Amino acid sequence: MKNIIYFFVLILSSMGLFLFFTSNNDLSLSNIPKTASQEDVVAEKKIPDPEKPIDPKADIGPQNKLENPPSVIKAIYSTAWSASSAKKIEYFIDLIKTTEANAVVVDIKDYTGNLSYDNNIELVKKYGAIEVKISKPNALIKKLHDEGIYVIARMAVFQDPALTKARPDLALQSISKNTIWKDYKGISWVDQSSKEVWDYNIAIAKDALNRGFDEVNFDYIRFASDGNMADIKYPFYDAKLQTKRQVMNSFFKYLRENLPGAKLSADLFGYTTIHQDDLGIGQHIDDAMPYFDYIAPMVYPSHYNKGFNGHANPAEFPYDVVYYSMLKADQRLAAFNESTTTIKTVDSKFRPWLQDFDLGADYDAAKIRAQIQAVYDAASTTETGWMLWAPTNIYTKDGLLPK
């Protein structure tokens, strides 16, 4: 009897289990709530994209302008090649840390017309006007800024073989040869009246400023002078409509309008300090005063003609040449500032280029110091600085005051 009872119990139990697992209350894995760890186990693992390797040649991001820049700029000049050399940069930094110098002028567009660093300026890339010498311009700016050094970007404007090659329609033409005109050094120029040329150079200046350069220095902002002037045919400039001075004055104004708020400086011939005409190249120092923060006449004594101020060799008299030139310049700036008819957009100051190279005389420490002292003695303000030009980028340290 017990065996029969056990048999029925076993049958009932088996039927119950069968109904339990086949009922609508399904307890399969798919309906069991998952914990976070379970979600991770069940879900398909997504393999992350591999990190892009860091390009050792890549530059850092744009830099801010130097905080608290010096009120009186005392600069040395550097070619792009020197700026690309770690050893040379350390030389500049050491010179500045141990002397009164506090700024560096760096070539970003020299007489070749090529930009010295890679960039994304549309027309520059289109024209192939790049020769990378400075691989990391932003990093260079940071390195100099970290040392408290003011950094100026120098660019040649109308002397531009790279642009004349890409755009011969913008170039000065030779009447006799029916080719692109070149000066005595074999360098070609673009038409100073071309708005395309103006905009092209402004785009370059904007790029430099956006990278963190504290200032842009414009050189070769003039008409050509060294060559057969009678053989020049201008594709745009028309002497019947405008004088050369009017063209350059319009260009100066255009620069300021398109680079508002930027620190700008202009390199002018030294003779503009004493001449009342435009020297046949369109440069008149008074025209630069409304638009440039710093005007930089190149008062190299070796560049003055024999007989200047009674000197058979002006290069031997650096103090006299620089003092006389800067005194006349300062008098003209004072008259400009006192005029009630002038329109000023900036508080312009003089910051001349001085000679630190042997030409006409051996330029030792005494001659370097004489030029600097002449700048100070001629100025009516203590805010006048200077820039030293040494093509070798090797400077006469003893001509500078120690820190």
What are these model-predicted stretches?
Residues 25-71:
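N-terminal, intrinsically disordered, polar/charged segments of Gram-positive cell-envelope systems
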Residues 64-75, 81-83, 158-210:
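Active-site-adjacent "subsite" loops/lids of carbohydrate-active enzymes
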Residues 77, 150-160, 217-218, 224, ...:
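Aromatic-lined carbohydrate-recognition surfaces of secreted/lumenal glycan-active proteins
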Residues 88-114, 210-215, 292-294, 375-386:
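Catalytic domains of carbohydrate-active enzymes, especially glycoside hydrolases
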Residues 104, 144, 151, 201, ...:
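Conserved, mostly hydrophobic/aromatic
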Residues 116-128, 160-183, 224-239, 283:
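Aromatic- and acidic-residue-enriched segments that line the glycan-binding/catalytic groove
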Residues 292-306, 315-403:
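Substrate-binding cleft of secreted/luminal carbohydrate-active enzymes
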